[in-house]
Amino acid sequence: MSTEWNFKEQGTIDTDGGKIWFGAIGNQDSAKTPLIAIHGGPGMSHSYLYPLSDLADERLVIFYDQLDAGRSDRPNNSQNWNLPRFLRELDDLRKALDLHRVAIFGNSWGGTIAAAYASSNPKGLERLILSSPLLSTELWLADNQSHRDNLPSELISVMQRCEEESQEASQEYQDAVDVFY
């Protein structure tokens, strides 16, 4: 795996609320279906999905940053933080890049977007790959609580105290959260 992105094309695309950044890497002339990679967050960037660039030897791989993330505009408008807008963002990306057929990879929150997009039965979606998607907030909260309950009691105490005192930015809390993750 190379350590450089080597985008063949990158730019911004207009979408509801601002401009989103994209970068395309790989073989644009490949007969294999182009892959769109959707990052988690919301608020993270595409950069941690770098290992997917290994697929660029055989197909076009498109990375993008959702609005308010990475290299995209950051209007910081809570009206933008809704699933239908994120779905339109994905449609805008496909239209702007003229992607008639695609495979979609979604990780975490990106998996939520990808699953919702797939459920709308969009034309040309050939493959869907979900990695640790959030498909049920209720189940996610229960899983997180179960994981937290299994931490050492001293870490649970630190986290509870810091949360009650609104000290989530403290180093003590951050150290406890690092163990959680």
Predicted regions and their residues:
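Active-site loop/oxyanion-hole signature of alpha/beta-hydrolase fold enzymes
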Residues: 62-109
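N-terminal cap/lid segment of alpha/beta-hydrolase-fold proteins
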Residues: 2-19
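Conserved HGGG/HGGXW glycine-rich cap/lid loop of the alpha/beta-hydrolase fold
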Residues: 14-75, 79
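Alpha/beta-hydrolase
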Residues: 160-181
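Alpha-helical elements of Rossmann-like donor-binding domains used by nucleotide-donor carbohydrate transfer enzymes
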Residues: 8, 85-92, 112, 116, ...
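Conserved hydrolase catalytic core segment
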Residues: 100-143
